[in-house]
Amino acid sequence: MQTILVLTTFLSAWFLAVGFDVFWNVPSQQCKKYGMKFVPLLEQYSILVNKEDNFKGDKITIFYESQLGLYPHIGANDESFNGGIPQLGDLKAHLEKSAVDIRRDILDKSATGLRIIDWEAWRPIWEFNWSSLRKYQDKMKKVVRQFNPTAHESTVAKLAHNEWENSSKSWMLSTLQLGKQLRPNSVWCYYLFPDCYNYDGNSVQEFQCSEAIRKGNDRLKWLWEESTAVCPSIYIKEGQLTNYTLQKRIWFTNGRLQEALRVAQPKARIYPYINYSIKPGMMVPEVEFWRLIAQIASLGMDGAVIWGSSASVGSKNHCAQLMKYIADVLGPATLRIKENVARCSKQACSGRGRCTWPKDTSVIAWKFLVEKEDYDFYLGDIECKCVEGYEGRYCEQKTK
C-alpha cells in the first residue's frame, strides 16, 4: 500500500507536465448500499473519480440524450420526441433547457474536468444514417416533400441531405458552444466522435477507416474545430472476443485511434472510451484491458475514460466483482502504464512530452508500456509529443 501511495504522489506531480489522465465514468455509487466504497480504491491507482463517487461531478460529467436540453430523436416504436429530427426541433427552447441542465449538473462555474455529450440516436453525416437509422433520412425526405410536392425524387434527396446536415450542425455546434460558454475551464467533447465503422479486415491497413468514412469525418471539420477534446470509443465487445483474433482486435483499436489523431485539432485532448464489462457478470479479459490502455498511451494521447453501465453495478455480486477487478486488473494496469508514460517522458522527452512510435506499422509499441519498471526505452524509435512551449524530436528546444 505504501508503495502505491508514494508512486501516486510522484505521478500526480509528473502528470502536471506530461499528462495521462484516466477518468472513472461508472455509476459505482450504486454500490454504497452494499457498504462498498470505490473512491479510496480508485484513488490508490491515480484514477480520476468524482467526489463522493457521484456520477456527475467535479472530474467528469456525461450528458445522456434525455439529460441535456430537448434532443430531437425517434424512439424504438417510431415515436417522435422533440420533433424527431433536428429540422423539426425547437433549438431555442433546447438551448434554454440545456443551460439549466449544465448549471445543475456542473455547479462550479470555474470547474475543470471532462464533459461529454452523448448523442447517439442519429448521425450528423447524412449517409452515415444507415440500417435502423435510415428512418431519419425517410422522415427528413417527407418534410422536404411537403414543401416541394412536385420536385423530382433526386431533388428531394439532395435537399434532404443538405437540410439534414445543416440542421444537425446547428444543433450539435450550438450545444457544444453553450457548454464551453457556461463552463469554459472544462474540456468538452461528443462521445463516439470520430467513429470509424471498421468492423472487418485482414490487415492493419484494412482496419483503417475507409476513404468514404474519412471523407464523411472531414465534413465534420466544424465539430473538430470547436471541440476541446475528442472521445472515440474502442470498447471490447463479446463478438470481437469470439470472432476476431487478438491481432484483429489490435488492428480494430488502432484504426479508431488513428482516426481520432487525424481529425483532432493540435491542442484538443484525446480521451478514448474503454470498457471493463462486456455484459453484467462478464469482465474484459485482463490482457485486453492492459492492451486497450497501452495502445492509447503509445500514441501519445492524453488519457482514457473507463465507462460502465448501471447494470454492471446492479447487484451486490456485480459490485463485489468490480471491486476485485479493480484491485487485480484495472488498477494495476492503469498505474503501471501511467508510470511508464512518465518514465518514458523522462528518458526520451526531457520530461516535456509523451513518447510516440510513429513508425510502428506493426502496432506493437504498446507492449513497451506494459513492461515492468526496469525496462529502458529505445530512443531511436521514439518521437515526442511535446507540451506547449517546447519542440524538437525529444522536446529539447523551447518554441521560438
Curated annotation (Swiss-Prot):
Q: Cite a GO CC annotation.
A: extracellular region
- Gene Ontology molecular function: any one: hyalurononglucosaminidase activity
Q: Would the keyword Ribonucleoprotein be found if you checked this record's keyword annotation? A: no
Signal peptide: which range, if any? 1-19
UniProt key word ATP-binding: no
What is the tissue specificity? Expressed by the venom gland.
List the active-site residues: E120 (proton donor)
Quote the EC number.
3.2.1.35
Q: Name one GO biological process term.
A: carbohydrate metabolic process
Which positions fall inside the EGF-like domain? 340-396
Cellular compartments annotated: Secreted
Q: Which domain of life is it from?
A: Eukaryota
For this protein, the record's PROSITE patterns field holds: EGF_1, EGF_2
The protein's assembly and partners: Monomer.
Q: What does this protein do?
A: Spider venom endo-hyaluronidase that is able to degrade purified hyaluronic acid (HA) and chondroitin sulfate (CS). Has no activity on dermatan sulfate (DS) and heparan sulfate (HS). Also increases the dermonecrotic effect of the dermonecrotic toxin (AC P0CE80), when injected in rabbit skin, supporting the hypothesis that venom hyaluronidases are spreading factors.
Q: What is this protein called?
A: Hyaluronidase
